[in-house]
């Protein structure tokens, strides 16, 4: 894709999200989502092959259905309230329709089927945008309507998402699919806290974006797409591979690393609201995520993958991809836990 075209498309994606974030009118919010969806499709189809075409079509159909449901929710709200203003007091039926539309856009269970398939069919750079930037707009709408959302509906979806995000990733060897299932689980954690403390949800989203962004940047740097190709990067770039493995554990929520902060805070908030069963269930199912990340780390770091290739050293030309953002992102994604006492300002 030529640079001017790419700049125009990326700026449309960004402006679409910004319109959703800043608008106080439902029609403008809907237009922002449509701009964002239509601009992201050329980015997904950057590598023009059948798999990318299929992934883009799946993405388009899902997002178009979600936009239709959103517009239906907006119209129902308009009929009952007579106003287009984005407000916290929505009609219950309109609120349910909008919640389902946003969860479809986010890829929460039971509307999660498109996420792994689309992520697997597109390049790493497109997957990075899909699993980070594209989550901001739907979550901002959920944040704005959080007081009128049906808590039981959201909690059911959250629990299912964390379960499916854990189970789905167990037998995967493709790194993009592993990150897609991880995304489903993280979205589950975010919507679990939505109706109780939306500020913690924003903190969780920031941490998730930092960790996923860093993971994708490191995968792009090493050109790793499978667990086998990741295990071969030990010989080529041992330092970067070790960073990837620590990041994987952080994404799984292992305590000394940054990924533990949002899970800790969400469990704390839920128990403050006298909920015991749900945070226990979320904590247990989060172990599934941690298990497949630990298994990936163990297999890559301490064992040799079965491979027909006897020569483990990859041919490599003298080229380095300059990524100035990587060092600070790696530090934030792994070493933020000591700063947790400062989080008390959120209360």
Swiss-Prot record:
Q: Tell me if Thylakoid is a UniProt keyword of this record.
A: no
Q: Which reaction does it catalyse?
A: a ubiquinone + NADH + 5 H(+)(in) = a ubiquinol + NAD(+) + 4 H(+)(out)
Q: Where are the transmembrane segments?
A: 3-23, 25-45, 59-79, 93-115, 149-169, 178-198, 200-220, 242-262, 274-294, 323-343
Gene (name only): MT-ND2
Q: Name one GO cellular component term.
A: mitochondrial inner membrane
Q: Where is it mainly found?
A: mitochondrion
Question: What PANTHER family does this protein map onto?
Answer: NADH-UBIQUINONE OXIDOREDUCTASE CHAIN 2
What keywords appear on the UniProt entry? Electron transport, Membrane, Mitochondrion, Mitochondrion inner membrane, NAD, Respiratory chain, Translocase, Transmembrane, Transmembrane helix, Transport, Ubiquinone
- One Pfam entry for this protein is Proton_antipo_M
Topology relative to the membrane, per the entry?
Multi-pass membrane protein
The kind of enzyme this is, by top-level EC class, is: translocase
State the species of origin.
Answer: Nandinia binotata
**Compartments where found:** Mitochondrion inner membrane
Q: What is the recorded name of this protein?
A: NADH-ubiquinone oxidoreductase chain 2
EC assignment: the record states 7.1.1.2
